[in-house]
Amino acid sequence: MKVMNNLKMAVAAVALLLMASCGSTKKMEGTGKVNAQNRKTETKAADAAEVASMKNLAFVQKVADNQVYAKNIVGNMTFNLQAAGKDITVPGKLSMRKDEVIRIQLFIPILGSEVGRLEFTPNYVLIVDRLHKEYIKADYTQVDFLQKQGINFYSLQALFWNQLLVPGVKKVSDSDLKKFSANLDETAENVPVSIRYGNMNYQWKANRNSGRIAEANVTYKDKGNGDSRLNLKYSDFKSVGVKMFPATQRMTLTTILNNKPQEAKLNIEMKSVKTDDKWDAQTEVSGKYKQVSPKDVLGKLMSM
């Protein structure tokens, strides 16, 4: 409709110019032709912009349509964490229930006993250290590296579930898709899809043909303390119903803590991806465990 309206306006404008020039000199007639040509140029530009907008929306819709329908994602995994000069690899398990919890359990090799648990819920972050019988429970504003990134549960959930996200929104709706920008002029296999929100910049790289997200980048601009960045790379996609889920996720976080640049890498390699729902989404911490300060979350993770 917008294209048709633009054409009608252009035709009307040309007609008015022709009528105005009927009793005028040749010079005025020439001016009418120039103005008519300008109108045609403007119409072509408007049409091109409309087509580009439709292509942008169609691609973003393709990316959004790749999200899995399952309520639960569960699977044993190999967990690797590199931070503070340490490199730790242990067996583990990833359990996620949509809109409720993201849980990472770490086990003692061979024995299989749980040594630690990292849990994200809509209201808090929970870290349980079984070896030292300690735990951290805090909301997202109390955890330094999450606060720096401006990350909450729903943004984390979208990143773990290999989906697009709109900051501050629980679920991306069809009307939200217009907020994303897809750089279809890129010639690479993956197309950048981005959205800005205040000091936050989110960018995904999605396959041009399938729309499947291969990488996500989150950047938080902070002039006072320096930028923070979170990069995720997805691979080894496995079938979950009619959709695909990345069994391997590699995350790199760079930020400033205590006025020093810090980098942490977290790698998850799931051996299988299941949709089992026979598990409790809430962790009850024993009264024998001591609650400690949430200030040094990375330190607590590395001490497990």
Q: Language model features by range: what are they?
A:
Residues 23-86, 294-304:
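N-terminal leader/targeting segments and the immediate start of mature chains
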Residues 23-28, 171-288:
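Gly/Pro-enriched, hydrophobic low-complexity segments
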Residues 18-21:
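C-terminal motif of bacterial Sec signal peptides marking the signal peptidase cleavage site
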Residues 2-11:
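Bacterial N-terminal signal peptides that target proteins for export
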Residues 101-154, 158, 291-294:
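An acidic-aromatic
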Residues 71-79, 90-94, 100-106, 116-118, ...:
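One face of beta-strands
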Residues 65-73, 83-88, 95-97, 118, ...:
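Edge/loop elements at the starts and ends of beta-strands within beta-rich repeat scaffolds
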Residues 57-59, 130-202:
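Flexible, processing/modification-adjacent segments and terminal tails
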